[in-house]
């Protein structure tokens, strides 16, 4: 059952930890001549990792914890000692949680208990001068700074994990039905929108158990946000089978059925491909049989199960129909629950260099590889700057600038710094 404060959407900013800096150090021991470099590497920054937890039922914690920050890696030490890697930040979320970027690009989802998803990856530690020593430069006087950890804004949504979704207009009897077929105890009353959050119930039929969701009532134009709107509709996407509950108290049950399907289609046409069961509730009313006869003439291609939650007529028939339809409906493809599913947000081509002519004498250079070495460089260290220039020449930036018409004395902008093209 869901907690009192059910929250199914949150907006957060994630910050993975930066890598620790490598350091410059030399061995200074008595009787050890020309001791050589001894600066250790920095440790890795912590990543932001979301973990599925079957005991979590809401995104309430995420709603109020806007910034999720993993710690930075520890700087290297002398005597060749590497800095410690930072611990990861683990964030527990309910099963059925989906992650998007701020511009609604899909990042990943959590479907199983203890499944993990790496949303923001920690930065690598910078190399100390011991690791940077080469045959040509056996005692470098520079070290690398740690890489920046990934950081960006995300949107998190919870879509309930249920096999069957009960849908219908407000007050058609969804909450009464889930109470009758399971041990769920949602609030039941005679006024509209009694259900304002999903309720789950487990139903068992001849040893086969499945989860049924009582979802908030639907009204016309729900796909535009009316009533519970999209807050309701998004939960249907997880369900394998939909049960349309039509009230015989309605003046036109067939019109209600059409409106329900129209709203599903407007929100996501794929929802109409799901298996459906039509249930007519409140069959104990005086004119219910007459309305049912007309409805069967209007809906000829789908069976209709008449139901009364007063006398519980046909309740077992409905349960067996749910069970049978579910067992003949394949599961949607999902990540292997035995393996952690991790997302890394590295671009497809890290070696691409982009050179844009901003004005007659200013050129902007960007690209993952260029920016990585930029952040690793200590620009207060002359030897480190010389190394940076050698790397840029080696990866072809100088050639790219010349192709764009750069001349000696022109300015080159990389990240937040200006350099002169020589």
Swiss-Prot record:
Keyword Cytoplasm: yes
InterPro entries reported in the protein's UniProt record: G_OBG (IPR031167), GTP-bd (IPR006073), GTP-bd_Obg/CgtA (IPR014100), GTP-bd_prot_GTP1/OBG_C_sf (IPR036346), GTP1_OBG_dom (IPR006169), GTP1_OBG_dom_sf (IPR036726), OBG_GTPase (IPR045086), OCT_dom (IPR015349)
Domain OCT: 345-422
Presence of keyword Zinc-finger: no
UniProt domain Obg: residue ranges: 4-161
GO molecular function, one term: magnesium ion binding
Residue ranges constituting the OBG-type G domain according to the UniProt record: 162-327
Function statement: An essential GTPase which binds GTP, GDP and possibly (p)ppGpp with moderate affinity, with high nucleotide exchange rates and a fairly low GTP hydrolysis rate. Plays a role in control of the cell cycle, stress response, ribosome biogenesis and in those bacteria that undergo differentiation, in morphogenesis control.
Residues annotated for Mg(2+) binding in this entry: 175, 195
PANTHER family assigned: DEVELOPMENTALLY REGULATED GTP-BINDING PROTEIN-RELATED, MITOCHONDRIAL RIBOSOME-ASSOCIATED GTPASE 2
Family of the protein in this entry: Belongs to the TRAFAC class OBG-HflX-like GTPase superfamily. OBG GTPase family.
Principal subcellular localization: cytoplasm
Cofactors, names only: Mg(2+)
Subunit structure: Monomer.
Keywords of the record: Cytoplasm, GTP-binding, Hydrolase, Magnesium, Metal-binding, Nucleotide-binding
This enzyme's EC code(s): 3.6.5.-
Binding locations of GTP: 168-175, 193-197, 214-217, 281-284, 308-310
Protein's name according to its UniProt entry: GTPase Obg
Assigned GO CC terms: cytoplasm
NCBIfam families from the UniProt entry: Obg_CgtA, Obg_CgtA_exten, PRK12296.1, PRK12297.1, PRK12299.1, small_GTP
GO biological process, one term: ribosome biogenesis
Pfam families tied to this protein: DUF1967, GTP1_OBG, MMR_HSR1
Localization in the cell: Cytoplasm
């Amino acid at each position: 059952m869901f907690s009192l404060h059910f929250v199914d959407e949150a907006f957060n900013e994630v910050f993975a930890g930066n890598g620790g800096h490598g350091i410059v150090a030399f061995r200074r021991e008595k009787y050890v001549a020309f001791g050589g470099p001894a600066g250790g590497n920095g440790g890795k920054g912590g990543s932001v990792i979301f973990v599925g937890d079957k005991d979590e039922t809401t995104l309430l914690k995420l709603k109020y914890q806007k910034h999720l920050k993993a710690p930075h890696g520890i700087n290297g030490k002398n005597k060749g000692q590497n800095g410690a890697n930072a611990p990861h930040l683990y964030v527990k979320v309910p099963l059925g949680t989906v992650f998007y970027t701020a511009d609604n690009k899909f990042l990943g989802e959590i479907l199983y208990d203890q499944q993990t998803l790496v949303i923001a990856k920690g930065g690598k530690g910078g190399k100390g001068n011991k690791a940077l020593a080469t045959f040509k430069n056996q005692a470098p006087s520079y070290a690398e700074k740690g890489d920046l950890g990934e950081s960006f804004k995300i949107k998190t949504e919870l879509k309930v994990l249920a096999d069957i979704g009960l849908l219908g207009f407000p007050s058609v009897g969804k909450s009464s039905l889930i109470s009758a077929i399971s041990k769920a105890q949602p609030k039941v009353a005679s006024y509209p929108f009694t259900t304002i959050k999903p309720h789950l119930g487990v139903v068992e039929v001849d040893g086969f158990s499945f989860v049924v969701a009582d979802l908030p009532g639907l009204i016309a134009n729900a796909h535009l946000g009316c009533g519970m709107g999209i807050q309701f509709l998004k939960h249907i996407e997880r369900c394998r089978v939909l049960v349309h509950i039509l009230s015989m108290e309605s003046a036109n049950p067939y019109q209600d059925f059409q409106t329900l399907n129209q709203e599903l289609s407007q929100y996501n046409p794929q929802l109409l491909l799901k298996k459906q069961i039509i249930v007519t509730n409140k069959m104990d009313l005086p004119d219910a049989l007459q309305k049912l006869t007309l409805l069967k003439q209007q809906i000829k291609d789908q069976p209709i199960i008449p139901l009364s939650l007063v006398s519980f007529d046909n309740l077992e028939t409905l349960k067996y129909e749910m069970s049978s339809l579910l067992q003949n409906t394949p599961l949607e493809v999902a990540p292997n629950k035995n393996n952690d599913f991790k997302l890394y947000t590295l671009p497809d081509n890290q070696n691409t260099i982009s050179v844009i002519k901003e004005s007659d004498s200013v050129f902007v250079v960007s690209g993952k590889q260029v920016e990585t070495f930029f952040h690793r460089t200590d620009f207060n260290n002359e030897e480190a700057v010389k190394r940076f220039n050698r790397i840029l020449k080696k990866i072809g930036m100088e050639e790219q600038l010349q192709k764009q018409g750069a001349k000696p004395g022109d300015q080159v902008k990389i990240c937040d710094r200006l350099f002169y093209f020589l």
